[in-house]
């Protein structure tokens, strides 16, 4: 391995494998080993066409000369195999798994690949959206969700894993999950069950340009989705996968790499060989990987506010990422973090529930037990609205109700330093929230929003048993979180803090926390970005912050040791400046 903490890998698509010459391959390899330093490739055997065996063997031979490890890969897309396939309206040429010729083709692909490699990965087109007559007939009375979840498990067992292991009993098969987690169940992706039958998994961390692509993904997903899938298959999440497409500037591409690395992956996958060989966007990668590798050697395990996202769930899409973008360290998990009296005090005692959490039919009872035992649960407004309708027993925990009206706010009332006092701040433009009401003094408001003489709470809490239940009202358009005034964001961060560290400042800065008293800051290089001054609050008495080095050469204009401004109220406060496109990591010295 070129790096101590991760392998750098790339992917070679079948069409390119078929046309590349040995001379071109060696020229590309020289470029990549100079600028990126590749440890491993996944060599694709099928994507609309089979890669020829002689070409595969040539690529493997050349990679051996460069000391590059080679595994296989397949992408489950295929052209029409006969005239009848023209009736099937297939997105991206994905397979119809009710069609026997296509089923036979996939089985053939699996067997072919297993005969060439001891490991292969399935790219994230392993889904179905086909609604042809054959699919309608086989679905019967089931919903498309039910049908596709069952169908893709059957396809995995009977057409991929079974045939491959029959050819090569030692084969290891990896399934890559896409970056559209909220839609998995509607297309057949089934991580809750697929994790049990595949040897390992992989994570799509492509976020590209968040505002100019059809998915509109917050950059933080490149970190948070890695962490979510680590909870899905602990120790078996093989890595994060991103690409240079729809990246209008260097930083847009590089930030995908940074955030993937901050999540501590085993592998960092840069899709794909022909897209990065000779691409100027790839030229800084090796330089930055050296820096990241040195930093990662000092970091413990990532930690943050656990966010419960059950399997096959949808709702509040990517709210955990929007919150991560405003500086709250997030730790999405697939199982509810229940605890008892003997559980250690820490992040496990705080959990965020979103509308996706409502997929769990036992969620309110789990929530009640969690809070009563001393936990602090935060729920989004979308969770609260859905729970009031679906699980009215939620009223046991709070007086909050939903009016079915909208709160338009440009004035905010935030806590002042002195108890019982308030500060007032205006936003640059109105922000809309769902209007939730509460009964004064039964539920206590931390922060209000509104206009003129009408305000309602957007952050309030109840006490229940030994715990605390907070309702966090998020904007109707989640990206409007970025537009909230700094004092509003600071109040949110303080209430949601699960790591003992919170930021006082504006948006566009993410905080990454680890379980060994280390943390990092990253200021996004997005439109309109600029250096930001902020304050950092750390629980307890802290002597100093020591910068974690990213090279053997000290950074001339960055202090290596930061002394506190002051200590007050059980916290130590530091001041600092963050620069767009630069990451800064520190060790807390007590």
Name the predicted role of every residue range.
Residues 1-4, 33, 57-71, 157-172, ...:
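Surface-exposed amphipathic alpha-helices with a cationic face
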Residues 5-27, 55-116, 129-132, 158-159:
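Active-site-adjacent "subsite" loops/lids of carbohydrate-active enzymes
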Residues 16-35, 99-113, 183-194, 222, ...:
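Short, acidic/polar
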Residues 20-30, 323-347:
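A short, well-structured beta->alpha microelement
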Residues 34-49, 90-146:
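Active-site groove signature of glycoside hydrolases
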Residues 44, 83, 118, 123-124, ...:
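Hydrophobic targeting/anchoring helices
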Residues 340-358, 378:
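Short, well-ordered secondary-structure micro-motifs within conserved domains or adaptor modules
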Residues 355-589:
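A conserved amphipathic helix/loop scaffold
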